[in-house]
Protein backbone atom coordinates (compact mmCIF):
# COMPACT_ATOMS: atom_id res chain seq x y z
CA UNK A 1 0.00 0.00 0.00
CA UNK A 2 2.83 2.41 0.76
CA UNK A 3 4.22 1.74 -2.71
CA UNK A 4 0.88 2.56 -4.37
CA UNK A 5 0.54 5.72 -2.32
CA UNK A 6 4.01 6.79 -3.40
CA UNK A 7 3.05 6.45 -7.08
CA UNK A 8 0.01 8.68 -6.54
CA UNK A 9 2.11 11.21 -4.65
CA UNK A 10 4.54 11.37 -7.56
CA UNK A 11 1.68 11.97 -9.96
CA UNK A 12 0.35 14.68 -7.65
CA UNK A 13 3.70 16.49 -7.62
CA UNK A 14 3.93 16.24 -11.41
CA UNK A 15 0.46 17.74 -11.85
CA UNK A 16 1.21 20.56 -9.42
CA UNK A 17 4.39 21.43 -11.34
CA UNK A 18 2.46 21.35 -14.60
CA UNK A 19 -0.21 23.61 -13.14
CA UNK A 20 2.43 26.13 -12.01
CA UNK A 21 3.89 26.30 -15.51
CA UNK A 22 0.52 26.66 -17.16
CA UNK A 23 -0.60 29.21 -14.61
CA UNK A 24 2.29 31.44 -15.71
CA UNK A 25 1.40 31.04 -19.36
CA UNK A 26 0.11 34.05 -21.23
CA UNK A 27 -1.19 33.00 -24.59
CA UNK A 28 -0.99 36.44 -26.13
CA UNK A 29 1.55 35.65 -28.90
CA UNK A 30 -0.52 32.73 -30.12
CA UNK A 31 -3.87 34.41 -29.66
CA UNK A 32 -5.57 35.01 -33.02
CA UNK A 33 -6.83 38.43 -33.96
CA UNK A 34 -10.20 39.38 -32.58
CA UNK A 35 -11.42 40.21 -36.04
CA UNK A 36 -10.21 41.27 -39.47
CA UNK A 37 -9.65 44.99 -39.30
CA UNK A 38 -9.95 47.80 -41.78
CA UNK A 39 -6.72 49.17 -43.17
CA UNK A 40 -5.91 52.78 -42.52
CA UNK A 41 -5.69 53.40 -46.26
CA UNK A 42 -8.76 53.87 -48.34
CA UNK A 43 -11.15 54.42 -45.48
CA UNK A 44 -14.47 55.56 -46.82
CA UNK A 45 -17.05 57.54 -44.92
CA UNK A 46 -19.99 55.47 -43.86
CA UNK A 47 -23.02 55.62 -46.07
CA UNK A 48 -25.14 55.40 -42.99
CA UNK A 49 -28.79 56.23 -42.90
CA UNK A 50 -30.28 59.28 -41.21
CA UNK A 51 -30.74 59.08 -37.48
CA UNK A 52 -34.08 57.88 -36.18
CA UNK A 53 -34.27 59.53 -32.77
CA UNK A 54 -31.37 61.62 -31.48
CA UNK A 55 -29.67 60.99 -28.19
CA UNK A 56 -28.70 63.96 -26.08
CA UNK A 57 -26.04 64.49 -23.47
CA UNK A 58 -23.51 62.26 -21.79
CA UNK A 59 -23.11 60.07 -18.72
CA UNK A 60 -22.55 61.72 -15.37
CA UNK A 61 -19.00 62.55 -14.38
CA UNK A 62 -16.95 63.26 -11.29
CA UNK A 63 -14.84 65.91 -12.99
CA UNK A 64 -14.34 69.32 -11.36
CA UNK A 65 -17.13 71.68 -12.34
CA UNK A 66 -17.58 75.34 -12.99
CA UNK A 67 -20.05 77.14 -10.71
CA UNK A 68 -23.59 76.44 -11.86
CA UNK A 69 -22.62 73.37 -13.90
CA UNK A 70 -25.36 70.77 -13.58
CA UNK A 71 -23.07 67.81 -14.07
CA UNK A 72 -23.21 65.50 -11.03
CA UNK A 73 -20.55 63.03 -9.91
CA UNK A 74 -21.06 59.36 -10.55
CA UNK A 75 -22.05 57.11 -7.69
CA UNK A 76 -19.06 55.75 -5.81
CA UNK A 77 -17.71 52.46 -7.05
CA UNK A 78 -17.81 49.32 -4.91
CA UNK A 79 -15.15 47.13 -6.43
CA UNK A 80 -11.39 46.78 -6.65
CA UNK A 81 -10.17 47.94 -10.08
CA UNK A 82 -8.09 45.39 -11.95
CA UNK A 83 -9.61 42.41 -10.20
CA UNK A 84 -12.02 39.91 -11.64
CA UNK A 85 -14.92 38.77 -9.52
CA UNK A 86 -17.58 36.12 -9.92
CA UNK A 87 -21.10 37.45 -9.74
CA UNK A 88 -22.74 34.05 -9.99
CA UNK A 89 -21.60 30.48 -9.46
CA UNK A 90 -22.47 29.19 -12.90
CA UNK A 91 -20.88 26.39 -14.89
CA UNK A 92 -23.52 25.46 -17.42
CA UNK A 93 -21.00 24.79 -20.18
CA UNK A 94 -17.24 24.19 -20.25
CA UNK A 95 -15.28 27.40 -20.70
CA UNK A 96 -13.34 27.29 -23.99
CA UNK A 97 -9.97 28.77 -24.73
CA UNK A 98 -10.33 32.21 -26.30
CA UNK A 99 -11.85 32.01 -29.76
CA UNK A 100 -12.27 35.34 -31.58
CA UNK A 101 -15.35 36.26 -33.55
CA UNK A 102 -15.43 35.11 -37.14
CA UNK A 103 -14.80 37.27 -40.17
CA UNK A 104 -18.53 38.02 -40.10
CA UNK A 105 -18.08 40.59 -37.32
CA UNK A 106 -19.20 44.12 -37.96
CA UNK A 107 -21.98 43.18 -40.39
CA UNK A 108 -25.70 43.48 -39.99
CA UNK A 109 -28.63 41.90 -41.83
CA UNK A 110 -31.26 44.53 -41.23
CA UNK A 111 -34.68 44.45 -42.85
CA UNK A 112 -35.23 47.42 -45.11
CA UNK A 113 -38.37 49.42 -44.37
CA UNK A 114 -39.00 52.67 -46.18
CA UNK A 115 -35.44 52.76 -47.53
CA UNK A 116 -33.56 52.35 -44.25
CA UNK A 117 -32.83 49.55 -41.75
CA UNK A 118 -35.43 48.82 -39.10
CA UNK A 119 -34.20 49.46 -35.53
CA UNK A 120 -34.60 45.85 -34.42
CA UNK A 121 -31.66 44.67 -36.52
CA UNK A 122 -29.72 47.85 -37.12
CA UNK A 123 -27.22 47.50 -34.28
CA UNK A 124 -27.03 43.73 -33.53
CA UNK A 125 -23.97 44.01 -31.23
CA UNK A 126 -25.68 46.44 -28.83
CA UNK A 127 -26.44 44.96 -25.39
CA UNK A 128 -27.96 46.21 -22.16
CA UNK A 129 -26.14 45.46 -18.90
CA UNK A 130 -28.89 44.88 -16.35
CA UNK A 131 -29.49 44.16 -12.66
CA UNK A 132 -32.84 42.58 -11.76
CA UNK A 133 -34.00 43.26 -15.34
CA UNK A 134 -33.32 46.99 -14.92
CA UNK A 135 -31.11 48.70 -17.48
CA UNK A 136 -27.86 49.98 -15.95
CA UNK A 137 -25.50 50.57 -18.86
CA UNK A 138 -24.85 49.72 -22.47
CA UNK A 139 -22.25 47.39 -23.89
CA UNK A 140 -21.31 45.60 -27.09
CA UNK A 141 -20.85 41.97 -28.04
CA UNK A 142 -17.32 41.15 -29.26
CA UNK A 143 -17.58 37.35 -29.27
CA UNK A 144 -19.96 34.58 -28.25
CA UNK A 145 -18.59 34.74 -24.68
CA UNK A 146 -17.58 38.36 -24.13
CA UNK A 147 -19.07 41.84 -23.91
CA UNK A 148 -17.13 45.10 -23.61
CA UNK A 149 -18.41 48.01 -21.52
CA UNK A 150 -17.22 50.92 -19.33
CA UNK A 151 -15.50 50.30 -16.00
CA UNK A 152 -17.63 52.90 -14.21
CA UNK A 153 -20.70 50.78 -15.00
CA UNK A 154 -19.54 48.09 -12.57
CA UNK A 155 -20.85 48.59 -9.05
CA UNK A 156 -19.70 45.43 -7.29
CA UNK A 157 -20.91 41.92 -6.66
CA UNK A 158 -24.37 42.28 -8.16
CA UNK A 159 -26.32 39.73 -10.17
CA UNK A 160 -25.69 41.21 -13.58
CA UNK A 161 -27.26 39.93 -16.77
CA UNK A 162 -26.89 40.94 -20.41
CA UNK A 163 -29.94 41.70 -22.56
CA UNK A 164 -29.52 41.47 -26.34
CA UNK A 165 -31.34 40.79 -29.57
CA UNK A 166 -33.99 43.53 -29.46
CA UNK A 167 -34.16 47.31 -29.60
CA UNK A 168 -37.09 47.37 -27.16
CA UNK A 169 -36.16 46.89 -23.49
CA UNK A 170 -39.71 45.76 -22.74
CA UNK A 171 -39.69 43.07 -25.39
CA UNK A 172 -40.46 39.50 -24.33
CA UNK A 173 -38.38 38.04 -27.17
CA UNK A 174 -34.81 39.01 -26.29
CA UNK A 175 -31.93 36.85 -25.15
CA UNK A 176 -30.97 37.44 -21.52
CA UNK A 177 -27.76 35.77 -20.28
CA UNK A 178 -26.41 35.91 -16.70
CA UNK A 179 -22.92 37.34 -16.18
CA UNK A 180 -20.30 34.97 -14.83
CA UNK A 181 -17.38 37.36 -14.38
CA UNK A 182 -16.30 40.97 -14.95
CA UNK A 183 -12.75 42.23 -15.48
CA UNK A 184 -12.15 45.93 -14.79
CA UNK A 185 -9.02 47.69 -16.03
CA UNK A 186 -6.46 47.70 -13.23
CA UNK A 187 -5.71 51.43 -13.65
CA UNK A 188 -9.29 52.68 -13.87
CA UNK A 189 -9.63 55.92 -11.93
CA UNK A 190 -11.97 58.88 -11.48
CA UNK A 191 -9.76 60.97 -9.20
CA UNK A 192 -9.15 64.03 -11.39
CA UNK A 193 -10.56 62.81 -14.67
CA UNK A 194 -11.90 59.49 -15.93
CA UNK A 195 -9.12 57.23 -17.25
CA UNK A 196 -8.92 53.59 -18.40
CA UNK A 197 -12.71 53.37 -18.39
CA UNK A 198 -13.05 49.88 -19.84
CA UNK A 199 -14.25 46.48 -18.59
CA UNK A 200 -14.83 43.01 -20.02
CA UNK A 201 -17.93 40.98 -19.19
CA UNK A 202 -17.85 37.17 -19.37
CA UNK A 203 -21.20 35.56 -20.13
CA UNK A 204 -22.34 32.48 -18.21
CA UNK A 205 -22.77 30.62 -21.49
CA UNK A 206 -22.10 31.48 -25.14
CA UNK A 207 -24.66 33.32 -27.20
CA UNK A 208 -25.88 31.99 -30.53
CA UNK A 209 -25.51 34.46 -33.39
CA UNK A 210 -28.62 35.36 -35.39
CA UNK A 211 -29.90 38.17 -37.59
CA UNK A 212 -30.53 40.12 -34.36
CA UNK A 213 -27.29 39.22 -32.56
CA UNK A 214 -23.87 39.76 -34.15
CA UNK A 215 -20.42 40.78 -32.82
CA UNK A 216 -18.82 44.10 -33.64
CA UNK A 217 -15.24 44.27 -34.91
CA UNK A 218 -12.42 45.44 -32.62
CA UNK A 219 -9.72 47.57 -34.30
CA UNK A 220 -6.01 46.87 -34.32
CA UNK A 221 -3.83 48.82 -31.90
CA UNK A 222 -2.36 50.90 -34.73
CA UNK A 223 -5.77 51.95 -36.02
CA UNK A 224 -6.62 55.61 -35.37
CA UNK A 225 -9.96 56.95 -36.50
CA UNK A 226 -9.40 60.25 -38.30
CA UNK A 227 -10.84 63.60 -37.17
CA UNK A 228 -14.13 64.41 -38.84
CA UNK A 229 -15.06 60.77 -39.48
CA UNK A 230 -18.81 60.22 -39.20
CA UNK A 231 -19.66 57.55 -36.62
CA UNK A 232 -22.68 56.43 -34.61
CA UNK A 233 -23.37 56.07 -30.90
CA UNK A 234 -26.33 54.04 -29.62
CA UNK A 235 -28.00 53.45 -26.29
CA UNK A 236 -31.08 53.39 -24.07
CA UNK A 237 -30.09 56.43 -22.02
CA UNK A 238 -31.94 59.68 -21.37
CA UNK A 239 -33.21 61.56 -24.41
CA UNK A 240 -33.07 64.86 -22.48
CA UNK A 241 -30.69 65.98 -19.74
CA UNK A 242 -33.49 66.10 -17.17
CA UNK A 243 -35.64 63.48 -18.86
CA UNK A 244 -36.20 59.75 -18.57
CA UNK A 245 -34.30 56.87 -20.09
CA UNK A 246 -35.58 55.52 -23.37
CA UNK A 247 -37.37 52.22 -23.79
CA UNK A 248 -36.36 52.00 -27.48
CA UNK A 249 -32.72 51.96 -28.58
CA UNK A 250 -31.64 55.44 -29.75
CA UNK A 251 -28.94 56.49 -32.19
CA UNK A 252 -27.09 59.66 -33.17
CA UNK A 253 -24.41 60.45 -35.73
CA UNK A 254 -21.24 62.15 -34.46
CA UNK A 255 -18.05 63.65 -35.86
CA UNK A 256 -14.80 62.33 -34.38
CA UNK A 257 -12.46 64.70 -32.53
CA UNK A 258 -8.99 63.45 -31.53
CA UNK A 259 -8.15 63.62 -27.83
CA UNK A 260 -5.62 66.48 -28.12
CA UNK A 261 -8.13 68.91 -29.63
CA UNK A 262 -10.96 67.64 -27.43
CA UNK A 263 -8.87 68.16 -24.31
CA UNK A 264 -8.22 71.78 -25.28
CA UNK A 265 -11.92 72.41 -25.99
CA UNK A 266 -12.99 71.08 -22.59
CA UNK A 267 -10.17 72.89 -20.76
CA UNK A 268 -11.26 76.17 -22.36
CA UNK A 269 -14.89 75.54 -21.39
CA UNK A 270 -14.06 74.71 -17.79
CA UNK A 271 -11.14 77.04 -17.28
CA UNK A 272 -9.16 74.04 -16.12
CA UNK A 273 -5.39 73.58 -16.27
CA UNK A 274 -5.55 69.81 -15.87
CA UNK A 275 -5.55 67.33 -18.72
CA UNK A 276 -9.12 66.08 -18.98
CA UNK A 277 -8.91 63.83 -22.04
CA UNK A 278 -5.78 61.72 -22.03
CA UNK A 279 -4.31 59.39 -24.62
CA UNK A 280 -6.65 56.42 -24.74
CA UNK A 281 -9.65 58.70 -25.12
CA UNK A 282 -11.44 59.98 -28.20
CA UNK A 283 -14.34 62.42 -28.55
CA UNK A 284 -17.51 62.76 -30.58
CA UNK A 285 -19.51 65.87 -31.39
CA UNK A 286 -22.78 66.73 -33.10
CA UNK A 287 -23.27 70.35 -34.16
CA UNK A 288 -26.94 70.21 -33.21
CA UNK A 289 -26.04 69.20 -29.67
CA UNK A 290 -27.00 65.52 -29.68
CA UNK A 291 -24.83 62.81 -28.20
CA UNK A 292 -25.04 60.24 -25.38
CA UNK A 293 -26.50 60.75 -21.90
CA UNK A 294 -26.96 59.01 -18.54
CA UNK A 295 -27.76 55.37 -19.19
CA UNK A 296 -25.77 55.23 -22.43
CA UNK A 297 -22.47 54.64 -20.60
CA UNK A 298 -20.59 51.56 -21.74
CA UNK A 299 -22.29 51.55 -25.12
CA UNK A 300 -20.53 51.48 -28.48
CA UNK A 301 -19.32 54.27 -30.72
CA UNK A 302 -19.03 52.58 -34.11
CA UNK A 303 -17.82 53.65 -37.54
CA UNK A 304 -18.29 51.93 -40.89
CA UNK A 305 -15.12 51.29 -42.89
CA UNK A 306 -15.18 49.32 -46.13
CA UNK A 307 -18.68 48.05 -45.34
CA UNK A 308 -17.56 46.74 -41.95
CA UNK A 309 -18.62 48.24 -38.60
CA UNK A 310 -15.78 48.77 -36.16
CA UNK A 311 -16.10 49.86 -32.53
CA UNK A 312 -13.82 52.83 -32.06
CA UNK A 313 -15.12 54.00 -28.68
CA UNK A 314 -16.98 53.18 -25.46
CA UNK A 315 -19.31 55.81 -23.96
CA UNK A 316 -17.42 57.19 -20.94
CA UNK A 317 -18.25 60.73 -19.74
CA UNK A 318 -19.22 64.26 -20.63
CA UNK A 319 -20.45 67.57 -19.26
CA UNK A 320 -24.22 67.71 -19.06
CA UNK A 321 -26.31 66.36 -21.92
CA UNK A 322 -26.62 67.65 -25.45
CA UNK A 323 -24.97 71.02 -24.88
CA UNK A 324 -23.85 72.91 -27.96
CA UNK A 325 -20.05 73.04 -28.11
CA UNK A 326 -19.52 70.25 -25.56
CA UNK A 327 -18.01 67.08 -27.06
CA UNK A 328 -18.58 63.74 -25.36
CA UNK A 329 -15.64 61.58 -24.27
CA UNK A 330 -15.21 57.92 -25.19
CA UNK A 331 -12.66 55.25 -24.32
CA UNK A 332 -10.68 54.57 -27.51
CA UNK A 333 -10.88 50.82 -28.11
CA UNK A 334 -7.80 50.48 -30.34
CA UNK A 335 -5.63 51.89 -27.53
CA UNK A 336 -6.72 49.01 -25.28
CA UNK A 337 -6.54 46.16 -27.79
CA UNK A 338 -3.43 44.66 -26.17
CA UNK A 339 -5.11 44.81 -22.76
CA UNK A 340 -8.22 43.13 -24.15
CA UNK A 341 -6.20 40.28 -25.70
CA UNK A 342 -4.12 39.87 -22.54
CA UNK A 343 -7.13 39.67 -20.23
CA UNK A 344 -9.06 37.27 -22.45
CA UNK A 345 -5.99 35.05 -22.73
CA UNK A 346 -5.41 35.23 -18.98
CA UNK A 347 -9.02 34.23 -18.37
CA UNK A 348 -8.53 31.20 -20.60
CA UNK A 349 -5.33 30.22 -18.76
CA UNK A 350 -7.02 30.68 -15.39
CA UNK A 351 -9.85 28.37 -16.37
CA UNK A 352 -7.37 25.76 -17.59
CA UNK A 353 -5.41 26.11 -14.35
CA UNK A 354 -8.61 25.68 -12.36
CA UNK A 355 -9.32 22.45 -14.23
CA UNK A 356 -5.88 21.12 -13.28
CA UNK A 357 -6.44 22.02 -9.63
CA UNK A 358 -9.65 20.00 -9.73
CA UNK A 359 -7.76 17.10 -11.32
CA UNK A 360 -5.10 17.23 -8.60
CA UNK A 361 -7.77 17.20 -5.90
CA UNK A 362 -9.38 14.15 -7.47
CA UNK A 363 -6.02 12.35 -7.73
CA UNK A 364 -5.23 13.17 -4.11
CA UNK A 365 -8.62 11.83 -3.04
CA UNK A 366 -8.00 8.61 -4.95
CA UNK A 367 -4.57 8.26 -3.36
CA UNK A 368 -6.11 8.52 0.10
CA UNK A 369 -8.73 5.93 -0.77
CA UNK A 370 -6.08 3.54 -2.10
CA UNK A 371 -3.92 4.07 0.98
CA UNK A 372 -6.87 3.21 3.19
UniProtKB/Swiss-Prot annotation:
Tell me the residue ranges located in the Extracellular compartment per UniProt.
Answer: 26-351
Keyword match Transmembrane: yes
Q: What tissue specificity does the UniProt entry give?
A: Testis-specific. Expressed by primary and secondary spermatocytes.
Q: Which domain of life is it from?
A: Eukaryota
Spans traversing the lipid bilayer: 352-372
Report any one BP term from Gene Ontology: proteolysis
Every Peptidase S1 domain range: 112-345
- Membrane topology qualifier: Single-pass membrane protein
Glycosylation sites (chain numbering) = 208
Q: Listed disulfide bonds for this chain? A: 137-153, 231-303, 262-283, 293-321
Give the Gene Ontology MF terms in alphabetical order.
serine-type endopeptidase activity
Active site, renumbered: 152 (charge relay system), 197 (charge relay system), 297 (charge relay system)
Q: Where in the cell is it found?
A: Membrane; Cytoplasm
Supply the InterPro entries for this chain. Answer: Peptidase_S1_PA, Peptidase_S1_PA_chymotrypsin, Peptidase_S1A, Trypsin_dom, TRYPSIN_HIS, TRYPSIN_SER
**Extent of the signal sequence:** 1-25
Q: Where do the record's region annotations for Disordered lie?
A: 31-72
The alphabetical list of record keywords is: Cytoplasm, Disulfide bond, Glycoprotein, Hydrolase, Membrane, Protease, Serine protease, Signal, Transmembrane, Transmembrane helix
The EC number on file is 3.4.21.-
Member of which family? Belongs to the peptidase S1 family.
Give the protein's recorded name: Serine protease 44
The record's gene field reads Prss44
Amino acid sequence: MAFQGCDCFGLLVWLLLLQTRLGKARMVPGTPSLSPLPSENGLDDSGVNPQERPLTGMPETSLPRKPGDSTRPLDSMAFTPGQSFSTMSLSRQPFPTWVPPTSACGHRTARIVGGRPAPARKWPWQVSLQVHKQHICGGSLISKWWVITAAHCVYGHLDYAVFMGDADLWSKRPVRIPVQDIIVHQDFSMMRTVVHDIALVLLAFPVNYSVNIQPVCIPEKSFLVQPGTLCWVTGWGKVLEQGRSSRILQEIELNIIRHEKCNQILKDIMGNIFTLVQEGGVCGYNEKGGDACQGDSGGPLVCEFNKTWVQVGIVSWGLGCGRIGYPGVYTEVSYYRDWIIKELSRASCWKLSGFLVLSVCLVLHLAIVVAL
